[in-house]
A protein has these predicted regions:
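Conserved lysine of the Walker
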Residues: 102
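Conserved GTP-binding G-domain of TRAFAC-class P-loop NTPases and closely related GTPase folds
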Residues: 207-384
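Switch II of P-loop NTPase G domains
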Residues: 54, 163-216, 223-231, 354
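Long, basic/Gly/Ser/Thr-rich N-terminal segments
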Residues: 1-87
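Walker A (P-loop) phosphate-binding loop of P-loop NTPases
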Residues: 99
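A conserved segment at the C-terminal end of the G1
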Residues: 105-115
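Hydrophobic anchor at the beta1->P-loop junction of P-loop NTPases
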Residues: 92-94
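Flexible phosphate/Mg2+-sensing switch loops adjacent to catalytic phosphate-binding sites
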Residues: 81-85, 114-153
Length: 384
């Protein structure tokens, strides 16, 4: 079975549909009501989809006879990339409380995977559809990297139904003693507003998204923890604004809500969960000199397990210090496999609406993903 990364339906390989290539001599475009219902808004005008008895790499349209290689999900009619169908990989979901910096994190993480981290891991990051390419360029890369503007807060899917996830395939070549194999991880990045997790209008799609995930990354804004705010210096405190009274900004509320959505039986959940404190740069001046969060990760093409454990314990201690130790205890009670992280997408406290004068200097943004690659046996772990 393949999980559609758009509607999250489980689809047997022999039920994958094809879409006519259209064009000269092909079928005329017509309204695709199924895709329209999935995306919301006006149904797009596209050549028709059709099913075949034994799907292969290509299929002939029964109406016009033209060959096509465009695969489509039978449930929502979204295009399924050939590479994704051949090697679908694990699905990683991203969830964050309101104001936790999800959009900025997505922009910087993808940029690092395409460049510095991708080169270190000998990994390729492939967008799975044209909408992903266009959305990343227009909504993430251009404003942040091209214009150095801060990204706007995520709109709730209730008011922004046309928002599709960004879908990428991260592929690594794993060289074993006997053979070489390609392993893939599917990053399905819904830039999910915190309130979406309690809205009846969209909860079904988000529920399928979360339950289809093989791992979840939670982004937590530590500046929403009163104990952490007390440690801010004057500049960081002035730029951070006040505490948000909205319950969707409370990290524990969001983690609890997701946990209850996922729970289908008693006992701890087995899905690996990475919980990352974003904007850690604002708090670094208050950390002890020997803190693991003062260290940058040393690039090695592997996961440094000693460093990983040191950062986890440091974040756990900080949560206790900030009177938020309940977060760590809740995770321990409800998940069999979880890890804590501290990161910063920008690397410094930004100006009111723009990146700081020092530019974008990401700090440990890749750490949660490296840990998940290690958990999925796609990355070696080393000590010493």
């Amino acid at each position: 079975l393949i999980t559609c990364p758009y509607c999250f339906a489980r689809v047997a390989e022999n039920r994958i549909m094809f879409r006519c290539s259209g064009g000269r001599g092909g079928c005329e475009a017509r309204a695709d009501e199924v895709l329209g219902r999935h995306r919301g808004g006006v149904p797009p005008s596209l050549p028709p989809v059709f099913s075949v008895r034994r799907p292969g790499r290509r299929a002939s349209c029964p109406e016009c006879g033209r060959e096509t290689s465009r695969r489509a999900c039978p449930q929502c009619h979204s295009r399924l990339a050939a590479e994704y169908c051949a090697n679908p990989g694990k699905i990683v979901a991203l969830v964050g409380a309101k104001g936790s910096g999800k959009s900025t994190y997505i922009a910087v993480l993808l940029h690092e995977l395409m460049n510095r981290v991708g080169a270190e891991l000998d990994a390729s990051l492939t967008p799975c559809d044209d909408r992903t390419i266009e959305r990343y360029r227009q909504e993430f890369a251009r404003p942040l990297y091209g214009e150095h503007r801060l990204l706007r807060a995520t709109q709730s899917a209730v008011t922004d139904r046309g928002r599709d996830p960004l879908v990428y395939l991260l592929t690594r070549t794993i060289r074993g003693r006997l053979r070489t194999r390609a392993e893939s991880l599917t990053l399905v990045l819904f830039d999910t507003a915190g309130e979406d997790l309690r809205s009846r209008d969209v909860s079904e799609l988000h529920l399928r998204y979360l339950r289809a995930a093989d791992a979840i990354v939670f982004l937590v804004d530590p500046l929403e923890l009163p104990g952490a705010r007390a440690a801010l210096n004057g500049t960081a405190l002035a730029r951070s604004g006040g505490l948000d009274d909205d319950p969707d900004s409370d990290p524990l509320n969001v983690i609890t809500r997701v946990t209850e959505l996922l729970r289908q039986s008693r006992g701890p959940l087995t899905v690996p969960v990475a919980v990352a404190l974003s904007k850690i740069d604002a708090l670094r001046p208050s950390l002890a000199r020997q803190s693991a969060l003062h260290r940058a990760r040393v690039p090695s093409g592997a996961l440094d397990l000693d460093d990983r454990e040191a950062v986890h314990e440091q974040v756990l201690a900080l949560l206790e210090e900030w009177q938020a130790g309940v977060v760590g205890r809740y995770l321990r009670q409800n998940y069999t496999d979880h890890a804590l992280f501290g990161l910063s997408a920008l690397g410094a406290v930004p100006e009111v609406e723009s990146v700081g004068a020092g530019g974008i200097r990401p700090y440990r943004v890749e750490d949660p993903l490296l840990w998940l690659l290690y958990r999925f046996k796609m990355l070696d772990g080393v000590r010493g």
